[in-house]
């Protein structure tokens, strides 16, 4: 498959938006620069759009939306906000173009709020007073389309069903034929709706039974009986779904003013993001069980709907995108999903690797190379940005920034290593050496791993240890003080049984390595080597030097370590069991112990444990407030003057909706945000 089959960006002109022009100043310039620095910061786009709308620069608003959709084509709330803005200005021609882009083709969105906006547009364009029966038919078709696309799959769809039902009930027929047609349509509507597990289902059932009684009390029992079993099943499944998805957050801004970090997806692997990801995966697992007994085609549509909802709210989760792509069976469709995923996550190694595999299956080496190049360029740009911040001293937390910088180096090196091995697999050693040539230009930016990886690649290719030695010697120029690199170099030499070179490397490096932990490992490695393949006098000589350097070390500790078998300390394990540390043993036997841990990783079992500790909703165990818990005086004063609830026959305020609104749409300013603002 050629690279031309990869889905094009929606708007070819979008890149122009990122470059500020000469006539842009002040807040607009600052917001554009923020987007340029971080093209995946959703909130920055919305802040810029909101600013441009206050300036009534609607042409610029459309340009920024275009740029945004190029990066996040499946983020439906942005399409919805844009459509609502255009509808408010009666820009119907623009609305039609936007609807064609976001509701059809490979980038079709399936969000109910977005489709409801489409429904609003259809109802505005088809006036029942002037259009009559023809307009009603068009609107009914639109309702049915929205129902088929997403409403029948969405558990939180009561607003749609209410709107559809009210529309049918408001129909005033002119004759008996139209009256019968209306009854048939309502009955068909109820039949479809009451089989769907969704919120407010019980109220709809009561409404239906009352309606049947009003239409014909003689036939009511028959029709109600036919639907009763399906309704009971749907009601039970909705309750089950609520339990499975307890704590799921699906907040999105209702307008540009309410957009904040609480209702917009945020990158990173925070506890909250991990918990939300697990809930989404639980939902998908539940759908796969097919408790609704759907046909294979309908089940596939329903699962796809949930996946698309998942990637909308977990847009920065590589695992969610990966799972969705693996659910797709066709390689070309999988490529489209992964390509779109990398628009929002251009620095994701896992998504890059998976997309490159898809291209490799089509023997498209050019696309494989382009895929890796985009990822490495993104990671390199991020590294330079972090390094610039560290050097300028903008962040006081220098230690944290240094750690972040090293993590970025690790990540970039890791991708280059996989890139190199992939090109060797696809196009041979020459292509791999080309990639290594790119790595050499980066010198100290990359970690030593790229030299070690290339050395093994050269050796495995045709047992060419001479080239491998040259590579490792080249790495020694930059990492001669790095104990981790020296240890790995020694491992390679020991593997090839190059005795003289082993001893030379040890003697030239032992005084240069500053990290005492790694220096200990180098000594112990040499002691173990001499114990197995050298002579006892050399062992004693090395031990003497070791204890002169580390006099506090335990004698028997060093003794047991030189009798390790396959990196396992069996003396401790089998005899001196009180000294044995299984975790430490397995850690070092797996080739770790370099003092730098890899990127953050959490298994599904760890996620489950974390959720059990914090609860599905991400809060720690909910303890009831004590009766004597202190409340602010202002709150107590307010409670004392509010009328008691028994004075009102109906609820004037839905407390839960108010709480949800405050949680999702209102961001309470912090001291830090006030200062930065």
Swiss-Prot record:
SMART domains: HAT (SM00386). GO terms for molecular function: mRNA binding. GO terms for biological process: mRNA 3'-end processing; mRNA processing; response to DNA damage checkpoint signaling; RNA 3'-end processing. HAT repeats lie at residues 56-88, 90-124, 138-170, 181-214, 257-289, 298-330. Pfam families: Suf. GO terms for cellular component: cytosol; mitochondrion; mRNA cleavage factor complex; mRNA cleavage stimulating factor complex; nucleus. It comes from the Eukaryota. InterPro entries: HAT, Rna14-like, Suf, TPR-like_helical_dom_sf. Disulfide bonds: none annotated. Keywords: Cytoplasm, mRNA processing, Nucleus, Repeat. Component of the cleavage factor IA (CFIA) complex, which is involved in the endonucleolytic cleavage during polyadenylation-dependent pre-mRNA 3'-end formation and cooperates with the cleavage factor NAB4/CFIB and the cleavage and polyadenylation factor (CPF) complex. Component of the CFIA complex, which is composed of RNA14, RNA15, PCF11 and CLP1. Interacts with FIP1, PFS2, YSH1 and probably also with RNA15. Probably interacts with the phosphorylated CTD domain of RPB1/RNA polymerase II. Present with 5350 molecules/cell in log phase SD medium. This is mRNA 3'-end-processing protein RNA14. The gene is RNA14.
